[in-house]
Amino acid sequence: MVEKWGEDYFLLGPYFPQKAASEFEPILDLDDSPAGRTVRRMREMGYSVQYGYWLVTGKPRVVLFDVASMYPLLDRIKFNLWESQRISTINTEDLVNQTLLFGEAVRVYLTAYADEHAKKSDVTAQFHEWMSSSGLSDLRKDNVKIALSFTTHATMLGRYLAQNVTDFYGKLPFFDWEQEARHYNIVTQATIERLSAQNAHVLTTVSDVTARECEVFLGRMPDLVTPNGLNVVRFQAVHEFQNLHVKYKERIQEFVLGHFFPSYSFDLDKTLYFFTSGRYEYSNKGYDLTLEALARLNWKMVQANMDMTVVMFIVTKQPYHSITPHVLQSRAVLDELQETCTAIEKQVGERLFLATAAGSDHKMPDLNNFVDEYWRLRLRRTIQTWKTDELPAFVTHDLVESDGIVEFCRQANLVNNERDRVKIVYHPDFISSTNPLFGLDYGQFVRGCHLGVFPSYYEPWGYTPLECVVRGVPTVTSDLSGFGDYIMQIMRDYENRGIYVINRKSQTFTQAADQMADILFKFVKMQRRDRIMQRNRVENISDVFDWTNLRSYYDTAHDLANKRRKP
C-alpha cells in the first residue's frame, strides 16, 4: 500500500506506550500534510494523539489515539451509540469499552480529515473488523465525504457457534443472529459488526467460506473476497532456504536430544518434525482431528515396523505456572554434557597430536590415557544425572488446568512410550527467540520443521499454512479454511506442490481422520530427496500470496466504494 499511495497512505490505531516504545517512531514536528494538520486539529480539540512511523516493512505513517485518556467520554459515547444506532452497550467489559473509545476517536479524526482533504481528492477508509468500526455507521449517517470499506476476517457469532454447536455449517442458514448474540452475551460486538457491514459502501471478507456467514449473521453478502497475503522474501538461490531448514532443524534437534534421550534414544537422521500452532480453540483449530490422526499414524507406523520417528509439536497459548522443572533440568544437563565432551575432545586432540609427533613407533596411542581423572569423573557424574527411567514429558509446562489436548493424549496413551513412533511435545506458549527451550523465533522454528498441520474446522482464512508455504514447508490444511478453499480454486495439482487439503465439508470426523492419517503416513514414507524436491515446489508458489499480487483485490474494493459514495 505504501508503494502505491506513498504519503497518501496512513494507518489509525490505539496507542499503547509499552508497545510503542519498540514499534513506533514519533514525528515531533508535525508536517503540513492533511494527516498532520488533522492531528494538530484533534489535539486542539483536547484529544491525546500520537503521529509518526510504524516500524515495519514499508514504514507507513500512523496516527495513534490514547484511548486511556478518553474514559471520561465513555458514557456520552455509549449514549450517542444508543440514540443514533440503537446499539446496546450496557455492562460491557473493558475490552469492548476500549474499542468504543477507539471507534469514536476514528470517527472524529476521519470527520476532521474529510473537512480538510475530501474536497480535493477521493478519500477511502478501510476498516478491519468490528473493533475499529463502532463509528462507521455514524460516518455514513452524517454523510461524511469518505468512501467506507469494511472487511471482516471472521464473524463474532461464527467463532462462538463453530466451537460450541455440532454441525455448524449444516445449521448455518437457520441461526437467528440476535438470539445467538444474546445467548453468548456478545450483543454489542455482534450489533456493531452487523451495522458496520450494512452501512459500509463496500463489504469484503477474506474467503468464500466466511462469505456464507456474512449473509446469515451480518445480513449482507460481501461485494467481493479479499484474500490475505504476506510480504514474501524470496531467495536468489534454491540452496539458501534449504540451508536455513538444515540450520534450524539442528536447533530443534538439540531440544529433542535433551528432552527424549535421557529416557531412550532414536535415530535423529530418521526423525521428522511436524507442528501445529494457533490460538487454543480445540475443535475450531482442528487440534481434535490432528490428535486423532496422529494416534492412527502411530498405529500404522508401529504395525509397519518402521524405523522412522515423528516428533509432533503442538504450539498454542494456555495458562501455565512455569516450564516443568524436569524439562528445564534436562536441557541444562544436556548443555553440561556438551561442554564436558567438548573439553575432553580438546584435551585428547592436543595430547594425541603431541604424542603422535613425538612417538618413535607407529602404534595407535591409548586415548583413555589422554583424559584427566577430573574430566572422567565429571563425565561419569553428568551421565548419571542425565539418565532417567521416566518417560519424556509430553507437555513442557505446568498447566493451570488440564485441557483437551492433555486429556486426549492420556486417553489414547500417546504419552511418549519408547515403542511409539509418534512423539508428542505440547508447548502451551507461543515460541519466541527468548524461549529457553528452543532459542528460536517462530519463523525460524517453522523453517526447521518438515510439515505444518492445520486441518481447521473454523478458519476464515488461515495464516499458519500460508506461513509454511512462504518458508518452503509443506502443509496440511482443510477445505473449511479460507486458505484451503482458495487453494482448491486456483490450483489443480496442489498436493504435488506440498499442500494437502483435508475434506471436512462432506466427510465425517472419522473419515477425515482416516484421510489425514493416510496423508501423514504417505509423507513419512517419502525419501529424503523427495521431501527436498517438495520443499522446492511449495516455496516456488509463494509469490502467489505476495501482497504485491493480492493488493489488487483491495484496490478493486476501494474503487467500488468511491463509485458508490458519489453515484
Language-model regions, residue ranges each:
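Catalytic cores of nucleotide-sugar-dependent glycosyltransferases that transfer UDP/GDP/TDP-activated
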Residues: 2-567
